[in-house]
Design a protein with these regions (language model features):
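Acidic catalytic loop of the alpha/beta-hydrolase fold
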Residues: 66-71, 98-99
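Short beta-strand/loop motif that positions the catalytic acidic residue
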Residues: 55-57, 62-64, 68
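Catalytic histidine neighborhood in serine/cysteine hydrolases
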Residues: 80-100, 111
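Catalytic active-site module of serine/aspartate enzymes centered on a nucleophile-bearing elbow/loop
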Residues: 103-122
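Hydrolase active-site cap/lid region
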Residues: 3-45, 51-52, 91
């Protein structure tokens, strides 16, 4: 199950800069990405859920709040489309970041339960 996940650190940083500063990222994101590469061994572009989900072979339930102000909901559609496994998508109207279960508990838990039941032998 993936909830409110970004496609990559690079995409998330771009979205945050756009929201906070109107989109002018200048050298900030590339500089921090380079610092990450030096210190941790990977750049923001390499820290990519999008690249990882393409290799996933297990079933994935994607859940995202449509009113997520932190991670744009559009990212879940890119992740869903990139997944080459059995998958299901649930977007929750009015739900902010990681609030899908709180905003629509019946919808959320029904989706989780039915998804899990598809893969559990009874």
């Amino acid at each position: 199950c993936i909830r409110d996940s970004y496609t990559s650190v690079w995409d998330q940083a771009k979205a945050a800069v756009k929201d906070l500063y109107g989109g002018a990222m200048g050298v900030f994101i590339p500089a921090v990405s380079l610092a990450s590469k030096v210190k941790f061994g990977y750049s923001f572009r390499e820290a990519s859920a999008l690249n990882q989900i393409r290799r996933c072979k297990i079933p994935v339930l994607f859940i995202h709040g449509e009113a997520d102000a932190l991670v744009p909901c559009a990212m879940v559609y890119r992740l869903y489309e990139a997944a080459n496994c059995d998958k299901q998508l649930l977007t929750v109207p009015g739900a902010g970041h990681c609030l899908s279960a709180s905003v629509a508990p019946k919808l959320y838990w029904s989706a989780v339960r039915s998804f899990i039941e598809r893969y559990i032998d009874r």
